From Swiss-Prot:
It comes from Prochlorococcus marinus (strain AS9601). Keywords: Cytoplasm, Hydrolase. It is an enzyme of class 3 (hydrolase). The gene is ureA. One of its GO terms (cellular component) is cytoplasm. InterPro entries: Urease_gamma (IPR012010), Urease_gamma/gamma-beta_su (IPR002026), Urease_gamma_sf (IPR036463), Urease_subunit (IPR050069). This is Urease subunit gamma. Pfam families: Urease_gamma (PF00547).
């Protein structure tokens, strides 16, 4: 299997996000890498599902709460930026203050 660097990045994000989802379902709090992977994956999947950049930016502030991440993580993650493929091309999605 030959994958481009971008495809390898997406697979890594998927793996880390899957781990994060499993830990959340067990009631564990996410650390920094898991938090970033979880949010990034939600953006990538939302774009794949046909959501707009503005929808994802708005929804992105509802995916995680402070109670779901380790202490100090909300302050560390003041924004998340990820390039996602939309039907009309690749766009940068920025979520400001994603953890409420």
């Amino acid at each position: 299997m030959h994958l481009s660097p971008q495809e390898k990045d997406k697979l890594l994000i998927f793996s880390a996000a899957l781990l994060a989802e499993r830990r959340l379902s067990r009631g564990l709090k996410l650390n920094y890498p898991e938090t970033i992977a979880f949010l990034s994956f939600q953006v990538l999947e939302g774009a794949r599902d046909g959501k707009s950049v503005s929808q994802l930016m708005s929804e992105g502030t509802t995916w995680l709460s402070k109670s779901q991440v380790m202490e100090g993580i909300p302050e560390m993650v003041d924004e998340v930026q990820i390039e996602a493929v939309f039907p009309d091309g690749t766009k940068l999605v920025t979520i400001h203050n994603p953890i409420n």
